[in-house]
Amino acid sequence: MDSKQQTVRLSDGHFIPILGFGTYAPQEVPKSKATEATKIAIDAGFRHIDSASMYQNEKEVGLAIRSKIADGTVKREDIFYTSKVWCTFHRPELVRVCLEQSLKQLQLDYVDLYLIHFPMAMKPGENYLPKDENGKLIYDAVDICDTWEAMEKCKDAGLAKSIGVSNFNRRQLEKILKKPGLKYKPVCNQVECHPYLNQGKLLDFCRSKDIVLVAYSALGSHREKQWVDQSSPVLLDNPVLGSMAKKYNRTPALIALRYQLQRGVVVLAKSFSEKRIKENMQVFEFQLTSEDMKVLDDLNKNIRYISGSSFKDHPDFPFWDEY
């Protein structure tokens, strides 16, 4: 099945495929893997591809997209591609610079969706994680509304079809929504979301504002030491997911993905295994009962895998608020 048929309308009139392919990989994974996996994903039916400047793999992901266009598998307009502006490019004059760098790496003319990756500005420069001599991150003071105005200009210039945010809490979303002279509101908020962190309150708030929630780490997480607390439980080992997978004759990953789709959440599935990439497309082939949805809702433990703890002293750190 082609996931293109399964889309959600964004507030600006564009449509986003509800199943997306995530391309982030820990540093030790060779970048060439991103090309290979993205090609497999497109062949399997994925049409929504998610990356970011920070992932430093856009050259490889772009190569996969362009090769699948060249061999006739897809046209450019069949692909929904997301990139994100990193924290060191929050100054208004740098937002478009970051996007143009991404487009150059990708060798594409536009992105379908451009997001502010985190609501925290860091010192501009070559380093994605600028640190002082004591190894402490160096922050920058930029009003998120100024960054947003630069995002609006990227949309007006045709470099991004839609614009949104990622890792924002309710207060930070409201700040943009209440901005005087707001031209375009964020179409989505991409956040960590899975049965252990189901984001129920944030989802309700976003729904009330016609903002789509997009789930990353929907299968738990890659568990990379730099970002993830190693003592956190492995989501896909959860016995409830395990028994439900048996009941539906699916995998625990498919149960976790289907859970999001039935809540109206756009979900990113990340895998570099050909078998699992193809398997994840089965999410459209079955439906969870409302009772089982309730059971999954009750798994919530507010466990955040990507805690962002290295940024926790940033004045705009998003995860202190309840949601």
Curated annotation (Swiss-Prot):
One of the GO BP terms on file: steroid biosynthetic process
Keyword Lipid metabolism: yes
Keywords: Lipid biosynthesis, Lipid metabolism, NADP, Oxidoreductase, Steroid biosynthesis
Top-level taxon of origin: Eukaryota
Binding site for NADP(+): 20-24, 50, 166-167, 190, 216-221, 270-280
UniProt EC number: 1.1.1.-
Subunit structure: Monomer.
Name of this protein: Estradiol 17 beta-dehydrogenase 5
